Amino acid sequence: MNTDARMGAGVSLKAEHYDQALACNLEGLWFEVHPENYMVGGPRLAWLNRIAERHPVSLHGVALSLAADAAPDQDHLQRLRALCDQIEPVLVSEHLAWSTWQGHYHPDLLPFPRSNEALQRIAENIQRCQEVLGRRISIENPSHYLQLQGHEWDEIDFLGELTRRTGCGLLLDINNVYVSAHNLGFSATAYLDRFPAQAITEVHLAGHSDDDQGSLLIDSHDAQVAEPVWALYRKLVSRVGPRPTLIERDDKLPPFTELLAERSIAQSIMTCPGVLP
């Protein structure tokens, strides 16, 4: 696990909070952004450059479409490489999903059957990305809403094999685990107990919501981290030790101080997971 020693708990960075992020001097604080919002330059990139001078920054992509039927878009990869060269992020990560297929774009992160063919294709795409970027990337475990047919691999084994073949890291999203466990009916604790600890480069904590019928949980990133997710996080840190941890928030954005309050809980758990903050 190669991560920046300065990284404790961080928060998602949104334009509404640029001023406060720049002024904040909390030890161990870092920020994560979606690189697609900064590739075109402009005022956003100027702000990010200033913040990156003071705090570690991580890039969490949503558009590489690693599980697609074709290689990642080369123009997009080159823009991502240019942003990496400029910002020097401490971590670069992407979702284990697809959003393009047979030349058509779908504005979502979509699931796929974990087949041998998918494993080979995704491993090749990860290797291409790492070669172009000149750095290791991390892959995030997905959230699930229904049981797909055609799986040939258990998810933990699939992720572990990707790390073995490509040397990539893993971004462990605990809210995704909790949501998926609820929706598909498996044990979140058992999943985390099997997750390959040595490959974890980053942890995500986020809020979720109920669907309209109330039967599914949605990985919505629009609420505070739920107590069951905090409980899973405490167990994880007790088992594997502290890892850079992000409070992920993308919608219904609260005041910056509220994000820092959640960040403080994560920081306390990283320091002493057995004590309730």
Curated annotation (Swiss-Prot):
Cited InterPro entries: MbnB/TglH/ChrH, Xyl_isomerase-like_sf
Gene3D superfamilies: Divalent-metal-dependent TIM barrel enzymes (3.20.20.150)
Pfam families, A to Z: MbnB_TglH_ChrH
Family: Belongs to the UPF0276 family.
PANTHER family in the cross-refs: UPF0276 PROTEIN HI_1600 (PTHR42194:SF1)
HAMAP family in UniProt: UPF0276 (MF_00697)
The name this protein goes by in its record: UPF0276 protein PP_0992
Species, as recorded: Pseudomonas putida (strain ATCC 47054 / DSM 6125 / CFBP 8728 / NCIMB 11950 / KT2440)
